[in-house]
Amino acid sequence: NSDGVSGVIWKRPDNKHVLWFMKKTGSATSTRLLTALTTWNVIATGDFNGDGVSDIIWKRPGSQPLLWLMNKTGTVKIAKVLTALATWTPYASADFNDDGISDIIWKRPDNKHVLWFMKKTGGPKTTKVLAALDTWVFTATGDFNADGIFDIIWKKPDNKYLLCFLNEDGTFAVKKILAALATWNLVKDKVAGE
């Protein structure tokens, strides 16, 4: 709802989704039932049109993903089917080019990772295949060098973690092996105060 406080989407035992608008104290200010989606799951959230309100991507088995561009009230402003993506899996949503709009990394059935730079209409402005990552596992994203562009940590087949600082065009500015972490597992990609 663009108030600067993250909301929460819950799935109840009856498979209905409920959106909680949160306040700074940690309790809900109001709730909204997201109807007619009992067989769908939330696969990504982010501000996919740059209006300051978080949006939702839904998917159910065998279906095309459905993008909801949201209003501040928690109602749907525009619903868009993301065509030809029934077999694609989203791995991350973040602003990978510092334009104020959340972008999406997808994994295709051929194991290629594709970065979608999103535009204000809620569709991809440009796409980029992230080369040579077929056997790598996406692990985390965050702005690890404070340049306004989100970066990526991958886990390679040899269990080494690779930190990739991204440029605005989706290319890797710097790749850095995070040494001595082959037997470690990432627990949380954000810590308190960040």
Locations of the language-model features?
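Trp/Gly-enriched beta-strand/coil motifs that build multi-repeat beta-propeller-like domains
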Residues: 1-194
